[in-house]
């Protein structure tokens, strides 16, 4: 069964279920993980029955016979076994897994009788993190501090303010604070805040396709926690990237190129970082942040390695007390370790029980926070390194990457070019723009060591073929090899056409199938401005007047009269700072009235015609819905 035949809602549920079983987070389910699942679920089943079910699932699911179940195989299990006893037991086990609260489906989209589950541990961890992050924010005094042992969190997110603040903490300046409604809130102004939060979350790469403002207002636990985890994770991972943290080059291994290191995901870099310090401590390496850290020993040695040694001015030494290592009881040992983490100000995300149970999500967050506070890495001085290769991604590249991630592509795109080199993400994007993909022609990971790149190249050739023949894109001079090798210009040419088609498709759906092009959008913008008696207009998406953002702001006010506070704007003789100030307000206001805008304020100031087109197209979509 191809992924394309699974709804977005169901896909999200399947991903959640998969993550619960895949405790080591390596992207595959092993025989042992299936066994552990049934044990953790405390189902009244005899041991031989658990063994039978596990063997049955492995036999049915492991289609390529590699001894593990991939996500695609997992989807097939769920569809192939829908009505069998094995399937029912499997689902029951997933829903009953310890620490998971199951609640009946209440969303209109969810079928009657489904169960959405959420983790008490996650709620506890996120509440403590948010309390600390927002403790001094006067706009959050009405809800902070929240009690982690109650449902405070699910009520607190209901007005959108906490979500907006957390998004800005993860990616500063995403939301213009002037656009958040803070005082005397009404159902309408709350709805605006939630629009602003959801559309801004989407713009930083959160997958929010199945989450509506109503879900957040009602505080639906599994949706609230899912969104918060994405926002928190983006913030935690922001600096775990070579171009933003050159000291990470210290993690280069012998015979490895800078390019190899740059391809690693934040999770892989964190594991590499932890093992770098464990190696220096003369300890065994770890292979994950779940089963391998359950005894707290790796954490103890990691804390000892990264704790300040007193050799930096103004940073006093912290000597980690290692005596807790001798504790016989795992929980007690974990508690002693966390007391040492607290001395570094890093007791966040995990309890002693989370460590001992090997909760992969919360342990990953704990490690990421420790890295951000105490990386304890030094940029190599003498190594022959091409520092020029370390340039960060451009704004346009970041926008494209965030757009893809917001659509829920799997795997997540961390590095635009290397993560597209097998075209799997591109095929998913084709499906989003209604270009059918023959998944039987697609090679899927894991790729063999010998000939693996040939498999990826075959995918890329098929991706270009689909673009030319099915999507009717202009791909002159672009071959599969260009995608496979990460040719920037040619890869961007394809991605832009995918994003443009996606944007126009939405407009065409709203307009009852009527074809849309640039001229139609420009004419609609000018007509709408004229009808609202606004003085601004645009001649094209390259019009220099767009650099003031006034045509965008006037259009927003035309679509939702009275929404723009013109007192906050500079309208004549603008310098660059004033233009940027207007643009920040414009982008946030567009999101606030319900337009899912991915562009950045700088795109308006610099009049980047591609991104300008997407802004006006999204606003046109919003305006047409209003009619």
UniProtKB/Swiss-Prot annotation:
Protein name, UniProt field: Plastin-2
Binding-site positions, Ca(2+) 1: 22, 24, 26, 28, 33
Stored CDD domains: CH_PLS2_rpt2, CH_PLS2_rpt4, CH_PLS_rpt1, EFh
The EF-hand domain, residue ranges: 9-44, 49-84
Disease named in the record: Chromosomal aberrations involving LCP1 is a cause of B-cell non-Hodgkin lymphomas (B-cell NHL). Translocation t(3;13)(q27;q14), with BCL6.
UniProt superkingdom: Eukaryota
Modified residues (N6-acetyllysine): 76, 88, 294, 297, 361, 472, 542, 579
GO biological process: actin crosslink formation; actin filament bundle assembly; actin filament network formation; animal organ regeneration; cell migration; cortical actin cytoskeleton organization; extracellular matrix disassembly; positive regulation of podosome assembly
SMART domains documented for this protein: CH (SM00033), EFh (SM00054)
Keyword RNA-binding: no
PTM-bearing positions, type Phosphoserine: 5, 7, 30, 257, 290, 323, 406, 474
One GO term describing the cellular component: cytosol
Keyword tRNA-binding among record annotations: no
Function: Actin-binding protein. Plays a role in the activation of T-cells in response to costimulation through TCR/CD3 and CD2 or CD28. Modulates the cell surface expression of IL2RA/CD25 and CD69.
């Amino acid at each position: 069964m191809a992924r394309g035949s699974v709804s977005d809602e169901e896909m999200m549920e399947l991903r959640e279920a998969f993550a619960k079983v895949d405790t080591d987070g390596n992207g595959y389910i092993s025989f042992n993980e299936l066994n552990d699942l049934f044990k953790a679920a405390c189902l009244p089943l005899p041991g031989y029955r658990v063994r039978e079910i596990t063997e049955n699932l492995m036999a049915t699911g492991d289609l390529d016979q590699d001894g593990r179940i991939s996500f695609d195989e997992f989807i097939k299990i769920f569809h192939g076994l829908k009505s069998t006893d094995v399937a029912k037991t499997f689902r029951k086990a997933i829903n009953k897994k310890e620490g998971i609260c199951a609640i009946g489906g209440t969303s209109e989209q969810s079928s009657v009788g489904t169960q959405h589950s959420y983790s008490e541990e996650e709620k506890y961890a996120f509440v403590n993190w948010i309390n600390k992050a927002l403790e001094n924010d006067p706009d959050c005094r009405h809800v902070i501090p929240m009690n982690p042992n109650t449902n405070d969190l699910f009520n607190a997110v209901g007005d959108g303010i906490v979500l907006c603040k957390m998004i800005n903490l993860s990616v500063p300046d995403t939301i213009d604070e002037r656009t958040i409604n803070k005082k005397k809130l009404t159902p309408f102004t709350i709805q605006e805040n939630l629009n602003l939060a959801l559309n801004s979350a989407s713009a930083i790469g959160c997958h929010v396709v199945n989450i509506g403002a109503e879900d957040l207002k009602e505080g639906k636990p599994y949706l609230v926690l899912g969104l918060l985890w994405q926002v928190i994770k983006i913030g935690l991972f922001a600096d775990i990237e070579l171009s933003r943290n050159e000291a990470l080059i210290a993690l280069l291994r012998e015979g490895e190129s800078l390019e190899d290191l740059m391809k690693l995901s934040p999770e892989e870099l964190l594991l590499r970082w932890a093992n770098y310090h464990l190696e220096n401590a003369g300890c065994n390496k770890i292979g994950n942040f779940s089963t391998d850290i359950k005894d707290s020993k790796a954490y103890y040695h990691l804390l000892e390695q990264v704790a300040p040694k007193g050799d930096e001015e103004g940073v006093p030494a912290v000597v980690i007390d290692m005596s807790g290592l001798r504790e016989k009881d795992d929980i007690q040992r974990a508690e002693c370790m966390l007391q040492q983490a607290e001395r570094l100000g890093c007791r966040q995300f995990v309890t002693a029980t989370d460590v001992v149970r090997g909760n992969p999500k919360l342990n990953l967050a704990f490690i990421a926070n420790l890295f951000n506070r105490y990386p304890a890495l030094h940029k190599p001085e003498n190594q022959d390194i091409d520092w020029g290769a370390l340039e960060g991604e451009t704004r346009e590249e970041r926008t494209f990457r965030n757009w893809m991630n917001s659509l829920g592509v799997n795997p997540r795109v961390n590095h635009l070019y290397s993560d597209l080199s097998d075209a799997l993400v591109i095929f998913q994007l084709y499906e989003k723009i209604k270009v059918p993909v023959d998944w039987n022609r697609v090679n899927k990971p894991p790729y063999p060591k010998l000939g693996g790149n040939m498999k990826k190249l075959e995918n890329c050739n098929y991706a270009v073929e689909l673009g030319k023949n099915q999507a009717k894109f202009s791909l002159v001079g672009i071959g599969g090899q260009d995608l496979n090798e990460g040719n920037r210009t040619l890869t961007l040419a394809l991605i832009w056409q995918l994003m443009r088609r996606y944007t126009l498709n939405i407009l065409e759906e709203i307009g009852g199938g009527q074809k849309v092009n640039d001229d139609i959008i420009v004419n609609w913008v000018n007509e709408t401005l004229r009808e609202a008696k606004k003085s601004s207009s645009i001649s094209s998406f390259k019009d220099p007047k767009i650099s003031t953002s006034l045509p965008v702001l006037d259009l927003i006010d035309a679509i939702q009269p009275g929404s723009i506070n013109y007192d906050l704007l500079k309208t004549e003789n603008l310098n660059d700072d004033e233009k940027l100030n207007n643009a920040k307000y414009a982008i946030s206001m567009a999101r606030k009235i319900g337009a899912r805008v991915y562009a950045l304020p700088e795109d308006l100031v610099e009049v980047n015609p591609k991104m300008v087109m997407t802004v006006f197209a999204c606003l046109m979509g919003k305006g047409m819905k209003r009619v």
